[in-house]
From Swiss-Prot:
Native species: Daboia siamensis
SUPFAM superfamilies in UniProt: BPTI-like (SSF57362)
Assigned keywords, A-Z: Disulfide bond, Glycoprotein, Hemostasis impairing toxin, Protease inhibitor, Secreted, Serine protease inhibitor, Signal, Toxin
Disulfide bonds: C31-C81, C40-C64, C56-C77
Any one GO CC term of the record: extracellular space
Protein name as it appears in the record: Kunitz-type serine protease inhibitor B3
Amino acid sequence: MSSGGLLLLLGLLTLWAELTPISGHDRPTFCNLAPESGRCRGHLRRIYYNLESNKCEVFFYGGCGGNDNNFSTRDECRHTCVGK
C-alpha cells in the first residue's frame, strides 16, 4: 500500500473514532451514579448525566461532597458520558 493510501486509511480511522459515540461499556462508571447535592448548603447549578434519558441535565449542588457525576457545563458532561 502506498504512503498516500496509508494516510487516507489513518484519516478515515481517526474520523470514525471521533464520530463513534461512547457506548455504555466505554462510559466511566461514575456517569451511572445518581446526582448527589452533597452535605453543604450551597445552591450551585450543576450538570449531571441521566442514565435513563441519556442526557445531561441540571441539578443543584451544595458545594462539597457528592460524587463525580457533577459537571460545570453540558459540553463537559456530554464529552465524558454521552460522547461527541
